[in-house]
Swiss-Prot record:
Pfam families linked: DEAD (PF00270), Helicase_C (PF00271)
Protein name listed in UniProt: ATP-dependent RNA helicase dbp-5
Species whose genome carries this gene: Neurospora crassa (strain ATCC 24698 / 74-OR23-1A / CBS 708.71 / DSM 1257 / FGSC 987)
InterPro entries per record: DEAD/DEAH_box_helicase_dom, Helicase_ATP-bd, Helicase_C-like, P-loop_NTPase, RNA-helicase_DEAD-box_CS, RNA_helicase_DEAD_Q_motif
Chain positions of motif Q motif: 74-102
Major location (coarse): cytoplasm
CDD domains reported in the protein's UniProt record: DEADc_DDX19_DDX25, SF2_C_DEAD
Annotated stretches, region: Disordered: 1-47
C-alpha cells in the first residue's frame, strides 16, 4: 500500500505508526453479500452473490461435536424458514443469502438455540440475518406476548430495524412489531407486540414500570454490539437488561467492528457463542472510493465544502462533524450562502429527528450534516457521498484515531453492491496523521484530491458516482493467511 503520508502535501510531517491488526486464527473462504436495513432492502439481492472474501467461523462446540460440521446454504429454501417468511423474502426480491446470512443463519436457527457473535461489513445483510432468526423463533399465535427483543444504540436505527422486521414479515399473520423508544409506547397499554425493537434506556424504564412482560422472551439481539457494549452508560444498560431476561434466551450480537477488548467482553456477555469474524483488511468495501483533501487551514475546510456542494447533490450526501455546534454552524453558513442543507444530532427532540431523517430518506433533503449519532447502521439507499469534515477521534482528549467510527461513517454509502465516495478533510499534522493511521490499519490506498483543482476533483468523483456498474467487491487481504 502506498503510504498516505508520502502523498500528502505537508513536508516534514511523518505519520505515527499504525495500530497493529488484532491476531485472528484461521479463515474459511467463500462468497456472497446482502442488505442491512430499510428503504433499499427491496432493491439489492441481484448484486449480492458476486463478492468473495474470507471469513473465520469459530464454532464453540467444534471440538465436542464431530458430527456437526460447518456448512452453508446456497438458497433460503434450505433453511426451513416459515412459509410466510419465505414469501416476504420473495416479495422484496431476496433470492440468495448473503455471506453473513449463508454462514450465520444455519447456526442461529439450530436447535437447541446457540448464541452468536457475528462480524460483517456495513451493508452486507446483518439486519436481515437476525430478523430472519427472530421471525423463525416467535409464536405468531401469541401476537401480544413479547418474544423477541432487538436493541439498537439510537432511535433512528431502532425505527429502521422495526421497518425491516415489518417488511420481511409482511405475510406473517398477527405479527406486531413495536418500537420501544421515547414517546412510542402508551403508558396505558404498555408493550403489546411479539417483536420489540428499542433502545436500552427506554426498555429498562418499561420493565421497571411493569409495562413490558419479558418473561417469555426467546431472543435478544444487539445491533452495533461493539458500540453498545463498550460505550459508557449503554454498556451498563445492556448488561442490566440482559440480567433481567430469562436465562435460556438466545443472544445474537452483530456489528461491522469488534475491537479485541470488546470482543472479549462480548464472549462473556454471550457465552459459548458461535462466532463469525473478518480480517481487518477485509472490512472496507471496494465500491467506496476513499479519498482525502489536504486543506491549507481549518478555515479553508468550509470554503472547500461549499465548492463540493454540486457533487453532493448528484445523489444524497452525509457530512460528519465532531460536535453539534459545528453541525449547527455549518448549516447556518451554508444556508446563508444559498445552499439547501439539513442538520441532525442528539440535541433535537425525538420526533424532530424522525422528521429530519424521513425527509432525507425521501430525497426532499439531499445534504445532511450530522454527528456520530448517524454513523452506525442507518441505511439511505441514495447516499452516494460521505464527507468526514472532522476525522473521527476517541480516547481521553480525543487524541486517538477512531478507526471503527471511520469505517461505520463511510459505510453509509456504497451499500448493497452500489458505488460511493468518501472524502476526508485533513488540515494539520494531527488530522493527517490520524487519517494515515486509519488507512494503514485497514490497508487502504486513499486517493488524493487537489483543493486547488476542483475540475479534477469533480471528474474523479463523478467518475465514481455516475458509474453504471457497482463493483462493491471486498478489499482482498494482504496475504492469504489470517491476520
Amino acid at each position: 500500500m502506498a503510504d498516505l503520508a508520502s502523498r500528502i502535501t505537508k513536508p516534514d510531517e511523518a505519520p505515527a505508526a499504525a495500530p497493529e491488526a488484532a491476531p485472528v486464527s484461521a479463515p474459511a473462504s467463500e462468497e456472497p453479500k446482502a442488505p442491512e436495513n430499510e428503504t433499499s432492502i427491496e432493491e439489492s439481492q441481484s448484486n449480492l452473490v458476486k463478492n468473495e472474501y474470507e471469513v473465520e467461523i469459530k464454532l464453540s462446540d467444534l471440538q465436542n461435536d464431530t458430527e456437526s460440521p460447518l456448512y452453508s446454504v446456497s438458497s433460503f429454501d434450505e433453511l426451513g424458514l416459515p412459509e410466510a417468511v419465505n414469501r416476504g423474502l420473495l416479495a422484496i426480491n431476496f433470492k440468495k443469502p448473503s455471506k453473513v446470512q449463508e454462514k450465520c443463519l444455519p447456526l442461529m436457527l439450530s436447535d437447541p438455540p446457540r448464541n452468536m457473535i457475528a462480524q460483517s461489513q456495513s451493508g452486507t445483510g446483518k439486519t436481515a440475518a437476525f430478523v430472519l432468526t427472530v421471525l423463525s423463533r416467535i409464536d405468531l399465535s401469541k401476537p401480544h406476548q413479547p418474544q423477541a427483543l432487538l436493541l439498537a444504540p439510537s432511535r433512528e436505527l431502532a425505527r429502521q430495524i422495526q421497518t425491516v422486521v415489518q417488511t420481511i414479515g409482511q405475510f406473517c399473520e398477527n405479527l406486531i412489531v413495536e418500537a420501544a423508544i421515547p414517546g412510542a409506547i402508551s403508558r396505558e397499554t404498555g408493550v403489546r407486540g411479539s417483536v420489540v425493537v428499542g433502545t436500552p434506556g427506554t426498555v429498562m424504564d418499561l420493565v421497571k414500570r411493569r409495562q413490558f412482560d419479558i418473561s417469555q422472551l426467546k431472543v435478544l439481539v444487539i445491533d452495533e454490539a461493539d458500540n453498545m457494549l463498550d460505550q459508557q452508560g449503554l454498556g451498563d444498560q445492556c448488561v442490566r437488561v440482559k440480567n433481567m431476561l430469562p436465562k435460556t434466551i438466545q443472544i445474537l450480537l452483530f456489528s461491522a467492528t469488534f475491537p479485541d477488548k470488546v470482543l472479549r467482553f462480548a464472549e462473556r456477555f454471550a457465552p459459548n457463542a458461535n462466532q463469525m469474524k473478518l480480517k481487518h483488511k477485509e472490512l472496507t468495501v471496494k465500491g467506496i472510493s476513499q479519498m482525502f483533501m489536504d486543506c491549507p487551514t481549518e478555515k479553508d475546510k468550509y470554503d472547500i465544502l461549499c465548492k463540493l456542494y454540486g457533487l453532493m447533490t448528484i445523489g444524497s450526501s452525509v457530512i460528519f462533524v465532531r460536535t453539534r455546534e459545528t453541525a449547527n454552524e455549518i448549516q447556518k453558513r451554508m444556508e446563508a450562502d444559498g445552499h439547501k442543507v439539513s442538520a441532525l444530532h442528539g440535541a433535537y427532540e425525538g420526533q424532530s429527528r424522525d422528521v429530519l431523517l424521513d425527509e432525507f430518506r425521501s430525497g426532499r433533503s439531499k445534504v445532511l450534516i450530522t454527528t456520530n449519532v448517524l454513523a452506525r447502521g442507518i441505511d439511505v439507499s441514495s447516499v452516494s457521498m460521505v464527507i468526514n469534515y472532522d476525522i473521527p477521534m476517541k480516547g481521553p482528549g480525543e487524541r486517538e484515531p477512531d478507526a471503527e467510527t471511520y469505517l461505520h461513517r463511510i459505510g453509509r454509502t456504497g451499500r448493497f453492491g452500489r458505488v460511493g465516495v468518501s472524502i476526508s478533510f485533513v488540515h494539520d499534522r494531527r488530522s493527517f496523521e490520524a487519517l494515515s493511521q486509519i488507512a494503514q490499519f485497514y490497508g487502504i490506498d486513499l486517493i488524493q484530491l487537489n483543493p486547488n483543482d476542483l475540475d479534477d476533483t469533480e471528474r474523479k468523483v463523478q467518475e465514481v458516482i455516475k458509474s453504471s456498474r457497482a463493483q462493491a467487491e471486498y478489499v482482498p487481504s494482504a496475504t492469504d493467511s489470517a491476520v
